[in-house]
Design a protein with these regions (language model features):
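Serine endopeptidase catalytic core focused on the charge-relay Asp
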Residues: 37, 43-53, 57-190, 215-216
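Secretory targeting and sorting signals
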Residues: 1-24
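Extracytoplasmic low-complexity, Pro/Thr/Ser/Ala/Gly-rich segments
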Residues: 25-59, 68, 257-271
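Compositionally biased, intrinsically disordered/low-complexity regions enriched for serine, proline
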Residues: 18, 23, 27, 32-35, ...
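Intrinsically disordered, low-complexity segments enriched in polar/charged residues with Gly/Pro
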Residues: 2-3, 28-29, 39-41, 79, ...
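Short, solvent-exposed coil/turn segments
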Residues: 9, 17, 124-126, 193, ...
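Generic marker of residues within folded, mature protein domains
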Residues: 14, 41, 120-121, 203
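Active-site region of chymotrypsin-like
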Residues: 139-149, 172-271
């Protein structure tokens, strides 16, 4: 929630694997009754965000993603992950539907700062945090995205004009989920592929930060990061998930597999 506000100008491949080792997926709770899933709210030191995707490792530990800036400490306008302050790895994160807090086990912001990252696009749009759930809650998790179903895979390419889908869960909507499903178009990628600019109805608002983005085939491609006022008012910046996960693995982060949804992907509602 901290970062997804109006900030001027900025204000993150087909055939890719599901990012991680070839491990058997855990047994998931039924989607209809699972209280923990993509789209639930997370709370980090008072900052509310929306969870994106579910992940697991070779030992069947279960994780859920949020934006790295959800643990930021420098306020809403601090968007450069190589400079902005962050709570440390190990910070507890409340995940709606879970009985116990999870733990922040990876932050792209913390990792970039400790490694001296200097690439401008990476610093601006590498915006993912990984929360390890408490084992007591593993049996409460389903990886399906509400309303849309999926994800069905992972892609690093969404061309200008391609359909995009998301599901946000800002507390500003006061529990009204009618506007949570989002459908729109990609306006193209920039920053060396790190950022997808998208326009959806309705746009992402504070509290939707971190929410999942998938393409018209249900493939995961991004994490909601920013609300832009230029060049297109109410457009959103979406960090590229494939690059975020590759960066995590190559910089000592957990080696995770993106969990596929158990529910069929319904596809876009509009042509």
């Amino acid at each position: 929630m901290r970062r997804l506000i109006a900030v001027c100008a900025v204000v993150a491949c087909a055939g890719l694997a599901a990012a991680g080792p070839a491990a058997a997926a855990p047994t998931w709770a039924p989607a209809a009754t699972a209280p923990v899933h993509p789209g639930v709210q997370t709370l980090t030191n008072g900052g509310q965000c929306t969870a994106n995707f579910v992940f697991y490792d070779a030992s069947n530990n279960v994780y859920i993603g949020q934006a790295a800036h959800c643990a930021g400490t420098d306020g809403n306008t601090a968007t450069n992950g190589c400079e902005a302050g962050s709570l440390p790895v190990g910070t507890p994160v409340t995940v709606d539907g879970a009985s116990r807090p999870g733990s922040l086990v990876y932050s792209s912001w913390v990792t970039m700062q400790s490694g001296g990252e200097a690439d401008a696009g990476t610093c601006q749009y590498n915006d993912i945090g990984i929360v390890k759930l408490d084992p007591a809650d593993y049996g409460k998790v389903n990886p399906s995205i509400p309303f849309w179903g999926g994800p069905t895979g992972l892609t690093d390419t969404v061309a200008q004009g391609d359909k995009v889908l998301s599901y946000g869960n800002s507390s500003l909507r006061q529990g009204v989920t009618l506007l949570s499903p989002k459908e729109g178009l990609s306006l193209g990628q920039d920053a060396g592929g790190w950022n997808h600019t998208v326009y959806t109805v309705s746009p992402g608002i504070p509290g939707d930060s971190g929410s999942a983005f998938i393409d018209r085939q249900g493939r995961a491609f991004g994490v909601l990061s920013t609300l832009q006022i230029a060049p297109l008012p109410a457009g959103n910046g979406v960090g590229d998930l494939s690059r975020e996960l590759a960066y995590m693995r190559s910089h000592g982060g957990p080696n995770l597999t993106l969990a596929m949804g158990t529910e069929p992907f319904r596809g876009p509602l509009l042509p």
